[in-house]
């Protein structure tokens, strides 16, 4: 089933990282955390994912062509910390706002054979005084946030397979970064 009509900002964001990391979705079951309009979901399906479980705290955000795709199990108005996994998950995608990635990664750290392709938004890892109107304008602060995040990953048994800054900046100009992770066995 084609997903060509759903190339949103999210789609274009994950596209650069997935290509750079040579990430393989073929035949995999994917959990998309913070699915929003479905850009990450669409990309995963277009590149061979068997099924996507899309979890979104909001409602009515997923684009219509995706809402009716039988390969997608959409869970709207759902907090990821209340969500109960019923499927074996091969890949976790995450693009969340107003929330640190750390508690999400910690929550799923029992999934030892799962790959993680997640987007770090430094503005949501930052202290209030490190931002101006929600934007990190100081590159030194951004680099320190990234360094602290990577230290946290290592302390919590995550292995960084690859990482790169996003080709597209966030809507307000924040430079986001993708991580391809696995857990140490």
State each model region's role:
Residues 25-36:
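Conserved class I S-adenosyl-L-methionine
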Residues 168-185:
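Core SAM-dependent methyltransferase catalytic element
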Residues 158-167:
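Conserved S-adenosyl-L-methionine
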Residues 37-48:
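Conserved SAM-binding loop of SAM-dependent methyltransferases across substrates and taxa
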Residues 1-25:
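Class I SAM-dependent transferase core
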Residues 99-111:
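A short, conserved alpha-helix within the catalytic core of class I
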């Amino acid at each position: 089933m084609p997903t060509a009509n759903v190339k949103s900002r999210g789609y274009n964001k994950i596209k650069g990282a997935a290509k750079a990391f040579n990430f393989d979705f073929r035949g995999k079951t994917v959990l998309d955390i913070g699915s929003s309009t479905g850009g990450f979901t669409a990309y995963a399906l277009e590149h061979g994912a068997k099924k996507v479980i899309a979890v979104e705290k909001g409602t009515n955000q997923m684009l219509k062509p995706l809402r009716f795709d039988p390969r997608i199990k959409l869970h709207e108005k759902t907090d990821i910390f209340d969500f109960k996994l019923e499927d074996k998950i091969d890949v976790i995608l995450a693009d969340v706002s107003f929330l640190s990635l750390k508690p999400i990664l910690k929550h799923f750290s029992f999934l030892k054979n799962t790959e993680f392709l997640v987007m770090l938004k430094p503005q949501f890892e930052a202290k209030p005084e490190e931002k101006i109107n929600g934007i990190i304008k100081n590159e030194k602060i951004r680099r320190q946030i990234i360094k602290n995040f990577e230290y946290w990953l290592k302390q919590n048994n995550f292995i960084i397979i690859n990482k790169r800054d996003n080709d597209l900046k966030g809507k307000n100009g924040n430079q986001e970064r993708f991580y391809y992770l696995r857990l140490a066995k």
